[in-house]
């Protein structure tokens, strides 16, 4: 069936600010859907309140509404635009819930708007736990025994009938919000109350717990003719009991028998074809008894999800893009495979590689939180490793996490207490994979580990093989590792750093020996959807150790852009936005743009964005070999946050050109002592400070600069481990904590300017001229991290004298550091005197906010200035902002009950939204201003 020609304009509802359970995967799906619809000549209007998204860019949509995701905004858009249809399946639970609300209020009917890709009956059936249970039983598909409860009394009655352990699952929530396991009566009351409160309909399902069963997900597509394909089968490494967003997952499924797979496939087809009339993507989850192979249905999501983004990157099949086409009437057999461009989209991808996804947590930001994993998602991001084997993919994923590990094992950071280790293994701690490895090294039998964790023995044996390899290497010197053993070790995913640790050598020595003497190098393979059966046209690669290379090197001039790795607090979607715009500008400037990143949720890892995508850990060894393969003109590190910036020193030492600001200038800005010397030279005020290596030295510095002081480690992002302290005892505690996480770190102690105001500037310098992109004044006082502050653009209360000082200092610093491209400077203002707190010679988390508020493509300009192809005078700067824009932080405290919500110098927000106000009389602004100091803590 060809497309529905009556649809000429579509509204896509976004997912809003990043929260735990709903992250950048919806920016990826929304951007893909918008591009897909525009290819068909359809006008796309977008509603989203998140300024850090690519989907809210003029390059993606025809009309963008950066506004709260609520009914008022929907009505405003429908009054202002001729909208024929709405696509609510690209914005997660937020978009789906809003679409349902508008439907119940009769808004879609009133404005004659067709709902695409979703069926309200299907949404109601899948989101309402009781309706889903009945639907499954009608189809003859088993579910866990359960009862619905709409009150505390009904919940207690259900628990009595089912018995413990049991599960509480609230209706209409995302990321398992309010859900949890209950092992006994003592826990039940509190968890039931939380579940009822979390559900917007105050309804929960009380369900028998199937702890220890294996969990699988099928990512499927269906069109209007009931054509059906399974895009990807994902197996959870962790058994039932841990939210799939907190589970390590593997594709293709490694331990699934063909009989069980075929049965699951038949169930999924039956479910998706019988649930309603929608066309698009759907995620179906099953649990399988590891002994009997009995199958029960857990849940289904008739929309694009976190798993869809993972499945798209795992297979190369662009689910959101195809789902958008199906929503406007196309059928699968009418569409082309987007990778081969020759075969049909009506096919099931075949993988000749393995992917492993590992979540990324930020428990260190939520002191006192329960770190045990369960039904409620707690991860803030994720990474994906691609390899020829499970072991290689697992090691690459571990190398991508940026958690001070260099892979799984072989880094001297193992747990030594068997009790601590087994507790972490049994209670499903966030670092369970590392504790499992350590337990095996200590000789804990696999049978014991399997009984404690219920993880499939196949996976445990794979990890045991890695432990055995490590033991073998420990007995050898580097030169005793022959070519066969080296190849075997590298095929298992071990990094050169791990081999160096085991052989008591250096990473460089291992690299030289491996590549020069043994001639063992990485080759690059295509992610092609068809296991190399057809030629792929999409340049999407991963590295492995094999004989044939599938990544031809062109003779064009090339630039590599380093991505920002996994989402985490302090470094989120903002930096992915910067990377994508950098890549697009590089292409416009006539270079070949090469993207390197390991985050499956993001737009930067969409194979359609760069000329070449390397899905690799942003890890020195992988970058080094990629540079030797592609021989680029240089590498851009300014756009990928601290992840990319940390590799600047290695690039500098290797003699690779860093595009834009030089390594030495970056080091001056990052090194507090060098930066303070520069400020002194420029006659720019800064708070008194000192550096220390231990607690005794820190106390001496504090005496000199005066309490209160801000104590912090060097070279971190998001205010990691920063504290405001008021006496020697607190200072000692702060220093000990920093040294525990950052051994040998240079600790900085600054005099804290109490009751100062805070402001920041983002600017571009081209070697001649400075362009101030924006001056933002924080509503909250100094002491609350800039990422957790409400920032107002332009300033609302700073005097002309203060603004002049800030402009003057920005220009002085940019010239002195000889910046090429972007710089962010943070200021404290006290008694009309301006102090410089820090300078960041890179894109900042406020860069996208300014671009959106003023509607100026500053990142495009900055990238072209870094490349040296343009000067600031070549561009126009018309700031289209009436009134003020406020950058509002958004928190995910509800995922961590009982955790203090106080704010301080360490960042805790997971996302942000933008709000436009006409003037300072706006009631929303006045309310924010009244509360500005309430949350300040140490």
Located regions from the model:
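A short, GP-enriched loop/loop-strand-helix hinge that lies immediately N-terminal to
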Residues: 19-67, 80-127, 142-150, 568-575, ...
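C-terminal amphipathic alpha-helical interaction region
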Residues: 498-550
């Amino acid at each position: 069936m060809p497309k529905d020609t009556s649809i000429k304009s579509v509204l896509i509802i976004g997912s809003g600010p990043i929260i735990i359970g709903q992250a950048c995967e919806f920016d990826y799906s929304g951007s893909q859907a918008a591009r897909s619809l525009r290819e068909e000549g359809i006008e796309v209007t977008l509603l989203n309140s998140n300024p850090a998204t690519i989907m809210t860019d003029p390059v993606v949509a025809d009309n963008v509404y950066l506004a709260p995701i609520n009914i008022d905004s929907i009505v405003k858009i429908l009054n202002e635009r001729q909208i024929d249809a709405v696509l609510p399946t690209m914005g997660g639970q937020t978009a789906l819930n809003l679409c349902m609300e508008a439907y119940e209020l009769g808004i879609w009917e009133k404005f004659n708007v067709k709902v695409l890709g979703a069926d309200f009956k299907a949404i109601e059936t899948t989101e309402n736990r009781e309706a889903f249970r009945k639907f499954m039983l009608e189809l003859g598909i088993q579910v866990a025994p359960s009862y619905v409860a709409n009150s505390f009394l009904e919940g207690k009655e259900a628990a009595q009938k089912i018995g413990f352990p049991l599960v509480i699952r609230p209706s209409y929530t995302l990321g398992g919000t309010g859900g949890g396991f209950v092992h006994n009566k003592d826990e039940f009351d509190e968890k039931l109350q939380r579940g009822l409160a979390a559900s917007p309909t105050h309804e929960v399902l009380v369900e028998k717990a199937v702890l220890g069963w294996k969990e699988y997900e099928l990512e499927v597509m269906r069109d209007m003719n009931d054509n059906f394909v399974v895009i990807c089968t994902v197996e959870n490494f962790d058994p039932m009991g841990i939210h799939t967003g907190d589970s390590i997952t593997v594709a293709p499924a490694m331990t699934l028998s063909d009989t069980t797979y075929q049965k699951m496939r038949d169930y999924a087809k039956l479910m998706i074809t019988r649930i309603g009339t929608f066309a698009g993507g759907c995620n179906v989850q099953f649990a399988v008894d590891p002994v009997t192979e009995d199958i029960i249905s857990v849940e289904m999501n008739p929309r694009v999800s976190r798993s869809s983004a993972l499945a798209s990157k795992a297979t190369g099949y662009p689910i959101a893009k195809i789902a958008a086409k199906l929503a406007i009437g196309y059928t699968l057999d009418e569409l082309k495979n987007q990778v081969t461009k020759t075969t049909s989209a009506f096919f099931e991808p075949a993988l000749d590689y393995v992917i492993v996804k590992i979540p990324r947590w930020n428990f260190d930001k939520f002191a006192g939180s329960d770190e045990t994993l369960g039904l409620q998602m707690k991860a803030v991001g994720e990474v994906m490793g691609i390899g020829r084997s499970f072991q290689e993919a697992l090691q690459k994923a571990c190398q991508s996490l940026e958690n001070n590990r260099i892979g799984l094992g072989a880094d001297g950071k193992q747990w030594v207490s068997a009790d601590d280790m087994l507790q972490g293994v049994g209670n499903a701690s966030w670092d369970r994979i590392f504790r499992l490895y350590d337990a095996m090294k200590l000789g804990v039998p696999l049978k014991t580990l399997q009984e404690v964790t219920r993880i499939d023995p196949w996976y445990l044996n794979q990890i045991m093989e890695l432990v055995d390899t490590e033991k073998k290497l420990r007995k050898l010197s580097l030169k005793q590792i022959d070519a066969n053993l080296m190849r075997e070790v590298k095929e298992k995913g071990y990094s050169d750093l791990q081999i160096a640790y085991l052989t008591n050598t250096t990473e460089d020595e291992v690299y030289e020996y491996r590549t020069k003497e043994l001639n063992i190098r990485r080759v690059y393979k295509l992610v092609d959807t068809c296991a190399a059966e057809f030629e792929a046209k999409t340049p999407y690669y991963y590295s492995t150790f094999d004989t044939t290379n599938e990544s031809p090197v062109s003779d064009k001039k090339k630039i590599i852009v380093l991505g920002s790795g996994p989402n985490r607090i302090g470094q989120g979607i903002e930096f992915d936005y910067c990377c994508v715009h950098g890549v697009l500008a590089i292409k416009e400037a006539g270079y070949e743009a090469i993207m390197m990143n390991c985050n499956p949720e993001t737009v930067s890892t969409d194979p359609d964005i760069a000329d070449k995508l390397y899905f690799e850990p942003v890890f020195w060894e992988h970058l080094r070999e990629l540079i030797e393969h592609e021989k680029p003109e240089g590498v851009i590190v300014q756009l990928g946050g601290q992840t990319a910036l940390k590799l600047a020193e290695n690039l500098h030492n290797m003699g690779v050109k860093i595009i834009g600001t030089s390594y030495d200038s970056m080091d001056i800005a990052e090194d507090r002592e060098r930066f303070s010397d520069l400020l002194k030279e420029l006659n720019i005020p800064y708070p008194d400070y000192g550096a220390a290596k231990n607690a005794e030295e820190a106390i001496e510095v504090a005496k000199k600069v005066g309490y209160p002081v801000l104590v912090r480690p060097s070279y971190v992002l998001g205010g990691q481990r920063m504290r405001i302290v008021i006496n020697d005892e607190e200072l000692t505690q702060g220093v000990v904590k920093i040294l525990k996480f950052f051994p040998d770190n240079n600790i900085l102690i600054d005099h804290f300017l109490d009751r100062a105001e805070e402001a920041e500037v983002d600017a571009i310098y081209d070697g001649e001229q400075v362009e101030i992109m924006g001056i933002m004044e924080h509503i909250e006082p100094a002491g609350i991290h800039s990422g957790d502050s409400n920032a107002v653009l332009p300033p609302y209360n700073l005097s002309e004298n203060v603004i002049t000082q800030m402009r003057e200092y920005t220009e002085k610093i940019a010239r002195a550091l000889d910046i090429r491209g972007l710089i962010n400077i943070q200021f404290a203002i006290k008694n009309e005197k301006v102090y410089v707190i820090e300078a960041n010679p890179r894109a900042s988390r406020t860069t996208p906010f300014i671009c959106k508020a003023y509607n100026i493509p500053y990142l495009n300009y900055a990238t072209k200035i870094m490349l040296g192809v343009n000067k600031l005078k070549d561009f126009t700067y018309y700031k289209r902002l009436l009134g003020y824009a406020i950058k509002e932080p958004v928190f995910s405290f509800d995922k961590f009950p009982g955790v203090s919500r106080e704010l301080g110098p360490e960042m805790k927000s997971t996302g942000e939204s933008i709000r436009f106000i006409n003037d300072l009389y706006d009631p929303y602004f006045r309310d924010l201003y009244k509360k500005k100091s309430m949350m300040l803590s140490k």
